[in-house]
Amino acid sequence: MLIALLIILAYVIGSIPSGLIVGKLAKGIDIREHGSGNLGATNAFRTLGVKAGSVVIAADILKGTLAAALPYLLHVPIHPLLAGVAAVIGHVFPVFAKFKGGKAVATSGGVLLFYAPLLFVTMVAVFFVFLFLTKFVSLSSMLTGIYTIIYCLFVKDPYLLVVVTLLTAFVIYRHRANIKRIINKTEPKIKWF
């Protein structure tokens, strides 16, 4: 029973629509009606600006971190990665935003920030290298996921490898429209990096 409640709590934490809340507070807008229409950090940066976008990405990361920490904080015998995955699902399909959320990148990163902080730090560095080289946030996110799988092949943690592989596949799936735009050369590039 406690495990089920923890999973539900992790999902609810993940469901907190950071982009929607920050958009309303910072600019008085629903970011789902602007830019890509996505609740995630990339649309928040593009729609709300750097300050508000930074708040959104920090909140989205912290959702994953908090959810992964719940088993330790509440002394519930469940693997922290499972609680983290529940938060990622909540982020992508948020109960508080008509089940239309982000693309799972920042919240997945937050899970790894708690469970494998060194991996998280290297992921951030790799993401920015890819971003500098490609100028595509979406492609950088997907390539960072692939890097994460490769990293996990050298770590003796089968749970981490399985979860990272599933999350990366999910992130790539969530970016399928971006992949089409990259192929068609219509995906927007960042201009500030």
From Swiss-Prot:
Quaternary structure annotation from Swiss-Prot or TrEMBL: Probably interacts with PlsX.
Family statement: Belongs to the PlsY family.
Class of enzymatic activity (EC top level): transferase
Function in brief: Catalyzes the transfer of an acyl group from acyl-phosphate (acyl-PO(4)) to glycerol-3-phosphate (G3P) to form lysophosphatidic acid (LPA). This enzyme utilizes acyl-phosphate as fatty acyl donor, but not acyl-CoA or acyl-ACP.
Gene that produces this protein: plsY
Membrane-topology descriptor: Multi-pass membrane protein
Main location: membrane
Signal peptide boundaries: none
Protein name in UniProt: Glycerol-3-phosphate acyltransferase
Transmembrane is among the record's keywords: yes
Annotated EC: 2.3.1.275
